[in-house]
């Protein structure tokens, strides 16, 4: 009996907080077109993600994937760091 795994959501966003141990907060921007006016509206949603090695820093662009619940608010894990933040 072969069981197929469900497709998991993968998001790309910016790390807005890395103050917690092994946890990052990622802001994901989504653009939707308004039904009546046709204007693109930007929505931002924040997700907490598991970062096992504390590799991601604030300002990094990261990719996160849906996973089993790791805590009350953490349902994503870090897949990879797409772009590191530039420190001026």
UniProtKB/Swiss-Prot annotation:
Assigned keywords, A-Z: Ribonucleoprotein, Ribosomal protein, RNA-binding, rRNA-binding
GO BP terms, alphabetized: translation
GO terms for molecular function, please?
rRNA binding; structural constituent of ribosome
Do you know which PROSITE patterns this protein is assigned to? RIBOSOMAL_S17 (PS00056)
Q: Name one GO cellular component term.
A: cytosolic small ribosomal subunit
Give the residue spans that cross the bilayer.
Answer: none
A Pfam family name for this chain? Ribosomal_S17
Role summary: One of the primary rRNA binding proteins, it binds specifically to the 5'-end of 16S ribosomal RNA.
Subunit annotation: Part of the 30S ribosomal subunit.
User: Record's HAMAP family?
Assistant: Ribosomal_uS17_B
**Sequence similarity:** Belongs to the universal ribosomal protein uS17 family.
The molecule here is called: Small ribosomal subunit protein uS17
The scientific name of the source species is Leuconostoc mesenteroides subsp. mesenteroides (strain ATCC 8293 / DSM 20343 / BCRC 11652 / CCM 1803 / JCM 6124 / NCDO 523 / NBRC 100496 / NCIMB 8023 / NCTC 12954 / NRRL B-1118 / 37Y)
């Amino acid at each position: 009996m072969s069981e197929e795994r469900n497709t998991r959501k993968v998001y790309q966003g910016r790390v807005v907080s890395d103050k917690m141990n092994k946890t990052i907060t990622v802001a994901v921007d989504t653009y939707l077109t308004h039904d009546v006016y046709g204007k693109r509206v930007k929505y931002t949603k924040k997700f907490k993600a598991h970062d096992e090695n504390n590799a991601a820093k604030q300002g990094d662009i990261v990719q996160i994937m849906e996973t089993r619940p790791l805590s009350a608010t953490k349902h994503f894990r870090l897949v990879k760091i797409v772009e590191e933040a530039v420190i001026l």
